Amino acid sequence: MTKNDIIKAAFRVWGRELYQSTSLTTLARELGVSKPAIYRHFQDKQALLNAMHETFFDEYAAFIKPWYERAVAAQDAVESLFIMMRTIVDYYARNVDAFLFSLIQVYGDPIVGARDMTAHLNRRGVDLSSLSRFEADTQTYPSMVQLILATLTFIMAHFHKHEHTLDDHPSEERIRYIIALTEKKVADGLGFNKEMVEAIDYEGLENRIAGTVHDLEEDCLLRAVAGAVAEAGPWNASMEMVARRSGLSKSSLYSHFKNKQDMLRQLFLTEFDRIVRFADLGKQHSTVPEEQLYLVIIAMADYLRSRPEILVAIDWIRTRRLDLGHIAVSSRIYQVITDIQGLGSTGEQDPSGSVSAWIPQWILFLIVNTLMRRPAGMAFSELPNSSIRVLFKFIVSGIKGCTL
């Protein structure tokens, strides 16, 4: 057994549970060895995780570097970005273990993770920031590069969730399909008319719903739950932490929640209901489909900007699987968005082949991603509406709807 054997097995074994557990005992059982046999190669679990980081970046950079050089040399801005997008989708479609590792271990912290990725790739001769030279305004946030990477991450997650188990591999036909689907979504978004999107009175729409997120009575107990989740994550947030934040005793909490799972479930169900409520209220301020969708997006963004602990809690379930029973997140958001004329019958398919129920989830994913990856040092509430407008234009018209 070599160090590389252990590293490869760790990607496979810990990835199955999305790194909820990184047990050396489980890893040793998978390899058919004792834990001391692993310790002969790695001093401790952190040393193994560090080696996994190096292996991931070595293999990832080696795969994309030839195509990165072609992208940098390309004169056409769109083609440059698409070369890299196709390459990254190709790599992650073929390497689910690497995808899961990057999603959770590298991007686990939205801001630190992005810096970590950039630094590691730079040391290996891949400077993705150089592609921003193709954008007209490199100070605009979010950048096209960020929105493209977020979109392919979302599509990859759905692809691997619906296509196959973690122990088999997608066919070449399905890999070509997912590359084409990602390219179409990035290029065209939802296919809205660019001129109509540009003609929207964004400031007027924003003023119509300004302040409405503060009209809903707060549930102080659930806010304490959200604060604990934001602080420690859903796996490590405890009833004791919630009791301390709420001023209640742990025994008193059991009169509100059956157990920790029920506590988390109530939190997420309540918050998704609130998000959908504000989205629906926002939509009612216009009868124009393009305006309605922007009102939905700005209403959801407003709510999350005003509730940072809720935003961070939702970000946890954006990247991690939680055993909370059936939470019909998509059905709630799906109805609000697909009721908008032209979105309920797009006929588009998701990576599993079903009709476009994934579009509302993609929209929420991009909203959360944009807020969580805001510029360093900026509070959630400080993210300007201009950033939400950039996000909206990308969603409805793709990069064709944004100025490069």
Describe each region flagged by the PLM:
Residues V126-R133, A157-R223, G227, E231-A232, ...:
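C-terminal peripheral helix-coil segments that are non-catalytic and often amphipathic
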Residues N50-F56, L264-E271, I314:
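Alpha-helical DNA-contacting segments of helix-turn-helix folds
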Residues R86-A114, A157-K161, A301-L324, N369-A376:
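Amphipathic alpha-helical segments used for helix-helix packing
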Residues A51, P66-R94, L281-S306:
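Hydrophobic alpha-helical connector segments
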Residues M1-T2, I6-A9, M144, E217-A224, ...:
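N-terminal positioning helix adjacent to the helix-turn-helix/winged-helix DNA-binding module
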Residues D5, V13-A47, A51, A228, ...:
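Helix-turn-helix
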Residues P110-A136, P142-Q146, E173, Y177, ...:
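Amphipathic alpha-helical packing segments from all-alpha helical-bundle domains
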Residues K260, R274-I275, G282, S286, ...:
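C-terminal functional regions that serve as terminal interaction/effector modules
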